[in-house]
A protein has these predicted regions:
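Amphipathic alpha-helical regulatory segments at dimerization interfaces
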Residues: 48, 88-99, 183, 187, ...
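Sensor-regulatory modules in signal-transduction proteins
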Residues: 207-209
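Short hydrophobic alpha-helical segments used for membrane anchoring or interfacial signaling
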Residues: 106-111, 119-120
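Short hydrophobic beta-strand micro-motif common in sensory/regulatory domains
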Residues: 201-205
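Conserved segment of winged-helix/HTH DNA-binding domains
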Residues: 71-99, 125-128
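N-terminal helix-turn-helix
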Residues: 1-82, 86, 244-249
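Short, solvent-exposed recognition segments
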Residues: 125-196, 262
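Juxtadomain coupling helices with adjacent low-complexity linkers
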Residues: 174-175, 180, 187, 198-199, ...
Length: 262
């Protein structure tokens, strides 16, 4: 794409477009990859990336590829809703982790993806791509499916129109996923079986704030080692309900809506 053919954007808009190209599948990128995904000319991206690197928003590796810098993550932690959510949720996450020793995580909606805002993991847990700051696919994760199931029609339509495959188990049929989302909303939990990463299964439940709004999802991620993960559903549902009550007491979720955004 040339400067002339690039969509008209402000400098801030172009910088944000560059940062938005980074996600769980694109943690490290070349300039060419960033330019392609941001739909910006390479010369423009080169200038923007250089400035972002100077501000510690991006970090350049020895191989020349770039990744998100610590400044972006630190700024994200200052978002009041994420900070309060993490503070209230951590004791509940730790309780379940101590009992089962599997990774616990909390996610919120971030555009057409879910953002992992907190995760607890130990030596036995899987080394998968869900870490604090990760932006993961809504249709391939337990926490993502919960958020998607409770999202508005615009969000669901946008996601259903673009179902990337991550493993052989990833659901890429819009009709199948739409039916599953309806079931998730009714039954109150989501389960995944190696849909984002091979060897990983998950269960997730909604977290509600004031007014009954679903403002986040609580998930447990475990190795697919033959255990009946279904036995954890009641534990997760009870924990989710107790945590939701605390979130209401904390005043979170007053006007939260799960909707699509640019």
């Amino acid at each position: 794409m040339t400067e002339k053919s690039a969509p008209t954007r402000t400098v801030t808009g172009r910088a944000l477009a560059v940062l938005d190209t980074f996600d769980a599948k694109h943690r490290r990128q070349s300039l060419a990859s960033i330019a392609r995904r941001a739909e910006l000319p390479l010369t423009t991206v080169h200038r923007l990336v250089h400035e972002l690197e100077n501000q510690n928003a991006l970090v350049r590796g020895s191989d020349g590829d770039y990744e998100i810098g610590s400044k972006i993550w630190r700024l994200g932690l200052l978002a009041s809703v994420h900070s309060e959510l993490r503070e209230v949720a951590l004791p509940y996450m730790e309780d379940v982790y101590q009992l089962h020793n599997d990774a616990m995580q909390i996610a919120v909606l971030d555009g057409l993806r879910c953002l992992i805002v907190e995760r607890i993991a130990g030596s036995r847990t899987l080394e998968v791509i869900s870490k604090p700051g990760s932006r993961l696919a809504l249709h391939a994760t337990g926490v993502g499916k919960v958020l998607l199931a409770h999202g508005d029609a615009e969000l669901q339509k946008a996601v259903l129109n673009s179902l990337d495959r991550y493993t052989d188990q990833t659901i890429t049929d819009p009709g199948v996923l739409e039916t599953q989302l309806k079931t998730i909303k009714v039954q109150g939990f989501a389960k995944t079986q190696e849909e984002l990463a091979e060897g990983a299964v998950s269960i997730a439940v909604p977290l509600r704030g004031k007014g009954g709004n679903v403002i986040a999802a609580l998930g447990i991620v475990a190795p697919s080692d033959g255990r009946d993960l279904g036995k954890l559903v009641p534990v997760m549902q009870v924990t989710g309900a107790a945590l939701s009550r605390k979130l209401v007491e904390a005043g979170l979720g007053d006007a939260a809506r799960l909707q699509a955004s640019n």
